[in-house]
Each structure stands twice: as structure tokens, then as C-alpha cells.
Amino acid sequence: MKKLLKSVLVFAALSSASSLQALPVGNPAEPSLMIDGILWEGFGGDPCDPCTTWCDAISMRMGYYGDFVFDRVLQTDVNKEFQMGAKPTTATGNAAAPSTCTARENPAYGRHMQDAEMFTNAAYMALNIWDRFDVFCTLGATSGYLKGNSASFNLVGLFGDNENHATVSDSKLVPNMSLDQSVVELYTDTTFAWSAGARAALWECGCATLGASFQYAQSKPKVEELNVLCNAAEFTINKPKGYVGQEFPLDLKAGTDGVTGTKDASIDYHEWQASLALSYRLNMFTPYIGVKWSRASFDADTIRIAQPKSATTVFDVTTLNPTIAGAGDVKASAEGQLGDTMQIVSLQLNKMKSRKSCGIAVGTTIVDADKYAVTVETRLIDERAAHVNAQFRF
């Protein structure tokens, strides 16, 4: 049985090192791996000994914490219906632009994100008790990247309005077309991130250790760059701003310089995780395998961001969208020529959540002189991620 356990854990650890696959699980035996310190010797006394003091029971560890998520499995968390203009169904002419909102099927409902990445570098600090329990925290910085179909972001616009028609200045016009054949991606800045948790070695038998942990992490990065890759409305915004809690129609000045009532786009990230893992020590190597349950949310307050545009008409256009119908001869007297250009385009950053709650982690820890340790881990199923932790005991 011991040989089988050794074989399984070693194979899992070595396999994890050969592929790059939020919150790490960590080695369940970590509280008891480093039993000596670089400044103070470890204490292996009996907790029930009346002569033992808390000074003997407590120790500190510090080190580097790096967590790199290459693909987090996320989906949108939105309502089934979305309020916007009615979908055009007949040849009513360009002047018949909608002015009232109606409930339509939300194209963002249940959408899966194509890619979600997050990279964190932080300092790691742990308070150890009796070489069995760890209370730890991380303080550092994180950055992220999100990519998905434009339907996931409710990319909408008004199609069929006359650019040089008097109604273009009517604030009651609302978008009537949902654009779902394109891609939206965003990059966040590098911002402060923290996490806290606890880990315990619950059961030990020889060189095997069964342990559990619980962690919570939080960060709120701002959106550094937003790219909309769409043939009808393609644009890029650096440090985008938008409207929070604003229903259609948007302000006519939305997307222009000097507009008021907007705020910076930021994403409030929260995640909790509980895990159970089993390890087996083989001299200086301690491979482990574990399962985890986690829930992550990314909330941007459903901020709505408008396409950049000119505040005044220049050459009979306010946006530089490519035409759809191909009408390239724009004349002031030819009303409707610009009706084949998408107008008042905007998107919103919808709330996202974990699509899968359960995952597995495999890794190994290398311990040197019972004072230093390096852990390498990879996580699969609910995310593809790699984790590195290097620490020492005082």
C-alpha cells in the first residue's frame, strides 16, 4: 500500500511540472515540513506539557508567492432578459429608429468566456502553531486579461438612423441591434491584491499527511485597455470610463471628450476556496495531490462604455465605423446615406462567475535543511494554473 501511494503521488507531481495549467491548494504537510529555523531552533515538545509556553509553540515563515492563471473557466452572471430597442423586422426606412426599450432575450445569458488570465506576485507570511497549523496571508500585485464573444458584453448599436436627420440629436433613440459576431478583450492594470487563509495537518501516518485549507482573495484592478474587434464597430479605448446604473438611452455626449457622470472601469474580484489534500514525504521531496472547491466572481458594476466619437459632425460623420451597405458617396442632400453605419455603439462589462466549482491540484515541495522549502503546483479542471512558493522559517 505504501509503495502504491508513493507511486501515485510521485507520478502526479512529475506530471504537473510538465504542463502549465487563483488560489493554490498548497502542500497539506507544509505546517510540519520546516521544523527548524534560520534564527531560532525548532521546538518539538508536547502541547500537553504544562511546562510548554506559547513562545515554544509559535514560529514565523516568509517568502515569495507567485500564482499564474492561464485560463480560468468563467461564465456571465446576468438576467435572461435585456432592455433595448425592438429588433428591426421590416423595411421601415432609416428614419424609423426606435425610441422605447423593450424586453429582449439577453444574448449574454450563460455565455462562456473564451479566455481569462490572472497573474499574481506577492509576499507570503505564515504564522505556524505547534508545527501543525498555519495562518497565512499574501500581499502583492495582480494583473489580468479577459476575452470573450461580444454578446458576452452586450455590444449593441443603432442601425438604420439617418446621420444628417434631425432625430440624430434626439436623446430618446435607443440601440436596436446586438452584435454577436465579434470579439471583445480587455487588459487590467497591475494593482494591489491580498489573500488570507488557514491550513492544518489533520492526520499523519508515517510519512503520509492529510490536510485541509481555506482561503479568501480579493483585488480590484482597473481596466487599462479595452479592444472591440467588430466589422460594424471597431474601436480601442485606453483607461475606459463609463456609466454605472445608467439605462438606455445614454447621454448623447457619451463617448466624447469632456463627458461627465462617468467613472473609471474597474473589476472587483473575490474568490474563496476550500481544499483537501494528501502528501507523502520522500526524503527532501514531498509530492501531493488534492481536490478543491472554489467560487470566484468578477463584478464591474455592469458599467456601460460608449464607443469614442466626435462631439460634432465632421464630414457628415461622428464615428469612423466602416459602412455595412457599401454606400460611400455621402452627400448632405442625400438623407439616409449614412444609415448604413452603426451609431451610438456601447457595451457593458457584465458580472462573471466560476463555471466550474471543483478542481484538482498536483505538486511537490522540496525541503532543504528543514529551514527552506520550494513548492511547485499546477491546477486543472476549473482552471489551468501554475503556482510557485519559496519560503524560509525564522
Curated annotation (Swiss-Prot):
Residues 1-22 form the signal peptide. GO terms for cellular component: cell outer membrane; pore complex. InterPro entries: Major_OMP_Chlamydia (IPR000604). The keyword Signal applies. The keyword Signal applies. One of its GO terms (biological process) is monoatomic ion transport. GO terms for molecular function: porin activity; structural molecule activity. Part of a disulfide cross-linked outer membrane complex (COMC) composed of the major outer membrane porin (MOMP), the small cysteine-rich protein (OmcA) and the large cysteine-rich periplasmic protein (OmcB). Belongs to the chlamydial porin (CP) (TC 1.B.2) family. In elementary bodies (EBs, the infectious stage, which is able to survive outside the host cell) provides the structural integrity of the outer envelope through disulfide cross-links with the small cysteine-rich protein and the large cysteine-rich periplasmic protein. It has been described in publications as the Sarkosyl-insoluble COMC (Chlamydia outer membrane complex), and serves as the functional equivalent of peptidoglycan. This is Major outer membrane porin. It comes from Chlamydia trachomatis serovar L2 (strain ATCC VR-902B / DSM 19102 / 434/Bu). The gene is ompA.
